[in-house]
Amino acid sequence: MVSGGGVAAENGEMVGNGEGRKGAGASVLVTGGAGYIGTHTVLRLLEKGFAVTVVDNFHNSVPEALDRVRLIAGAALSARLDFIAGDLKSKDDMEKVFAAKRYDAVIHFAGLKAVGESVAHPQMYYENNVAGTMNLYSAMTKYGCKKIVFSSSATVYGQPEKTPCVEDSKLSALNPYGTTKLVLENYFRQVQAADPEMRVILLRYFNPIGAHRSGDIGEDPRGIPNNLLPYIQQVAVGRRPELNVYGVDYPTRDGTAIRDYIHVVDLADGHIAALEKLFATPDIGCVAYNLGTGCGTTVLEVVKAFEEASGKKIPIKICPRRPGDCTEVYASTDKAKKELGWSARFGIEDMCRDQWNWAKKNPYGYSANAEQN
């Protein structure tokens, strides 16, 4: 270990504490890269010419997902994809990851993300999401990695006072999961203020759905899905009898809640745009961007779009509203369009088409075991 956070390359050149490579060809560490959004982003990084290292502990993912990424990417691109088994909660694991090679930037997906689980197990969420991220950042600073794209969430808007949600809106959190994201946004602002060389982009996702057009990678939740589209998908393939619709008395066009659904491929492209912004903007500081379509879709509109895409009727069961659910949440996308040059390309029909393609090819996700929940 040399002073200033650099490490010595095999040829003796000091690396890791300067600018490093910029843009395509740069080395990117992706935490949680075997997950739903992670796999789609890793694939796009490879297609854009980046060298990618994934660190994952497979808590909510499987090795097969990365095998599928390699299959889609092909041998030439996959030669630039490495994997290191590791857990962000372990400082030793983070040391191992950063001692292995130099990274020009980090995209940080790893973390727990189920709202209900976070309410039941808040300690687990703080240990994984907050403490794990602090371990990651400590390793980054030790080894001179100064750029990070952080996976935040629209949950930081809490119950929005108005829609669309604008990046400078009042922030709040309604559950431990959302609180961990809010805590980490503040953490990154503060550590960046203390180290002006750090470049941080916070990406606030809305509701990612869909899958890669190949149908070879997609969302594969363990147990009962927490999100709407995976649940609809499981009803469509016969794994669940019906879809519970929570509330049909909202003041919306059909009585069901409105959300901003975004295609996971658009979301992956948003990460590429954010990464390129970090490389191009030395004085960026710490900046937040929404990633959504800017359009709200009701629950019943999603059901109808999926029925049309799949040709399957989705039985529904009307249930009371869930406490804390918002009537309407969707993004303002002006800032991302203006500053990142990014906007969503796919509509709800595209999202449902690609989700169904994934479901048809993989009715039980990455597992061939039809006995799984």
UniProtKB/Swiss-Prot annotation:
GO cellular component, one term: cytosol
Binding sites annotated in the UniProt record for NAD(+): 27-58
Cofactor: NAD(+)
Catalytic activity: UDP-alpha-D-glucose = UDP-alpha-D-galactose
Pathway: Carbohydrate metabolism; galactose metabolism
Entries under Pfam families matching the protein: GDP_Man_Dehyd (PF16363)
Known EC number: 5.1.3.2
Domain of life: Eukaryota
Name of the molecule in the record: UDP-glucose 4-epimerase 3
Organism: Oryza sativa subsp. japonica (Rice)
Phylogenetic classification of the source organism: Eukaryota, Viridiplantae, Streptophyta, Embryophyta, Tracheophyta
